[in-house]
């Protein structure tokens, strides 16, 4: 099966990057660094590392806070409540997200892989 580790730090004010997101898996690693908008990909197959600066739309920059994520999430929620758009994140999605956290805790404590099936999913 697939494996990955995600590390998100959004409170790194006293560092080079205010927000850092990285995911590591069997194929390599990807890092996203803000506010520099740098995406770096490293492949295990050839040990090549490639970085690029990603251009962010002005609308997203203007939205602020977490590069607009909070603004756009709240906007989508309001549209769904009004019946103007479909629900993007369901209660089932939330249930699965909590289960992933529980699985991670069990995995760390017991030094083993944990399946979603063990948690009733």
Regions inferred by a protein language model and the residue ranges of each:
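Contiguous beta-strand/loop segments that form the cofactor/metal-binding neighborhood of enzyme cores
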Residues: 1-37, 68-84, 102, 120-121
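Residue-level detector of alpha-helix boundaries and kinks
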Residues: 8, 62-63, 79, 89
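Generic secondary-structure boundary/loop-capping signal
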Residues: 27, 44, 113-116
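Mobile, glycine-enriched helix-loop/loop "lid" segments at the mouths of ligand-binding/catalytic clefts
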Residues: 31, 36-55
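Short glycine/proline-rich turn/loop motifs
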Residues: 54-60, 85
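A short glycine-threonine-serine/GTX helix/turn-capping micro-motif
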Residues: 60-68
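C-terminal helix-rich "cap/oligomerization" subdomain common to oxidoreductases
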Residues: 76-121
């Amino acid at each position: 099966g697939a494996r990955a580790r995600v590390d998100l730090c959004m409170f790194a004010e006293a560092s080079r990057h205010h927000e850092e997101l990285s995911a590591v898996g069997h194929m390599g690693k990807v890092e996203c660094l803000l506010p520099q908008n740098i995406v770096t990909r490293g492949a295990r197959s050839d040990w090549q590392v490639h970085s690029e600066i990603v251009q962010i739309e002005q609308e997203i920059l203007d939205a602020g806070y977490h590069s607009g994520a909070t603004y756009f999430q709240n906007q989508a929620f309001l549209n769904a409540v009004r019946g103007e758009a479909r629900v993007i994140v369901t209660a089932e999605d939330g249930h699965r997200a909590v289960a992933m956290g529980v699985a991670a805790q069990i995995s760390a404590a017991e030094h083993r892989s944990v399946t979603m099936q063990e948690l009733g999913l």
